[in-house]
Amino acid sequence: MLALIMAAIVGITSFVDPNDYAPDIEAVAGDNQLILDIQGDISWQFFPQLGISVKRIVFSNNVISAGSIDELVITAGLLNLLNTDFDQANLPIDSIKVVNGRARYIAPNLLPVQFDNIAISINNFSLDGGETDFSASAAVFGDLPLSIEATVALSHDGQKPNRVNATNLQLNVDQISINGHINADLENAQIVGKLSSPSINIRRQLKAIQLKLPIFSIPVMASATALTDVHFNSEFSINSKGYSNYTHQLFIDNQKFDVTVEADQTTGLMNTSVTSNQFRLHDYLPPQGSPSNNMQTGAIFAPLALPFVMWSGESQIELSVNEITMQTFSVRNLYSRLVGRANFIQLTSLNADLLGGQLNATAEFDLRDKQPSFTLQPQLNTIDLSQAFLALTGNPDVGGELSGGVAVSGIGDNLVTIQQSLLGIGQFSVINPIFSTFNVEQTVCQSAAMLSGSNSSGSFAAGTQLDTLEGNLNFADGQLIISGINTAIGNLKLRGRSTVQMIEQRYTLN
């Protein structure tokens, strides 16, 4: 029976030249916004399975600027051909194979990405909920390997696919592996899934990327083990028309970060929460004594801006970390809240304990105009200056409790312009200020004695203990003016004024 069927098929195909249908295939592709050009032959294939082989296909659309396939092979099982009740959900296709494809992917605001050596294999093809084996591989950035494997079940309502269920999903990007499953309800625009990864050595992966992209620079970090053990667990339920939620557990070098995201398309609101017990920030900064890298420091916290960039509505981000450790001090009980959109962001709260005191701040960042602008209102309370100087200079030569605040605004897109535009006022006070390295009263008395020609007598305590030190701050014309400086040493009253030329980096004291 099978021999007769094969003979009939061979007889029929010998009279049908599939190349005659190339213009029709290209026209159908054009109706679906795909520009298709079949440059090679379309031929029948009989072994190991009956099918069609298409050589040299060139294609493009709104996301693929240039694509090509050396060979596309589509096969059908004999039993499938016996069923003459063909429709969109019951096609007689058994397998699809793509050999040596290339594609140049383009996306708004991103650099184009070239994929080479594309290979796709689909076996046991089904649109009625049966399990289909899917695998694909490619190379990016020259020879960086990508691959994906999954068991896919597709369902069809007679007109279009309505459900996709991918199990045993494994995605590999060079040294990075991600496993999980995804279930998509296309009718209700709902995607539910779970993804996880084993330990990833991000540091080693970055080095591999740098070998292929020399323009890519690897950040210099203080710890040799920074970013060598990264993994995550992620669960999500996404509805492109309604409510979505994401729950992530991110582990970075044994530091756990819990990230939850809730987004509602109907209200246009997104809420993001990031919490952690500890973050060893100093591990990811340049080693102490090396040139500082503000861009690297900013890149560490750049992911916090993603909700504002990726979400078109209003976003709220809350960050809570029990302890952030630096090289010489720690920040504890950090809490911050950001609210806004991509072009206007408000820091409604920033609170932290550091250096024996507290930091509080609010701010606004307005990116709606050509020149970005901002306002900033930081407040320091009872900062221990001995701790601060020890942490920043290595010497606890200055002591006292610093409190103060400032309200400042600025505009510009570079440091010089911002410094020139700064406007604001503030004040500060230092309770029980002390300079441990010298005694001002002794110095003044000795100077007076020398001028009068007499000898200085009396004993003086080590260091200088001042009365409460107060002053006012004023930002204008690229200057920080410190006025109304007022303190005393015993009966000796001290007053002063200081000017800091921020652009020229000059300092004067009167």
Segments from the language model and where they lie:
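N-terminal Sec-pathway targeting helices
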Residues: M1-L4
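Terminal hydrophobic membrane-targeting helix
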Residues: M6-I96, E235
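Small-residue helix/turn framework positions
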Residues: G51-V63, S95-K97, R102, A119, ...
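A short, compositionally biased domain-edge/stem linker segment
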Residues: L78, L82-Q88, G298-P307, G412
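Short acidic, Gly/Pro-enriched loop/turn segments at secondary-structure junctions
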Residues: N80-F86, R102-Q114, S436-V440
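Long, internal scaffold/assembly segments composed of regular secondary structure
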Residues: K256-D258
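Intrinsically disordered, low-complexity segments enriched in small/polar residues
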Residues: Q288-P307, S454-S456
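Extracytoplasmic assembly/pore-lining segments of large envelope/extracellular complexes
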Residues: S330-R332
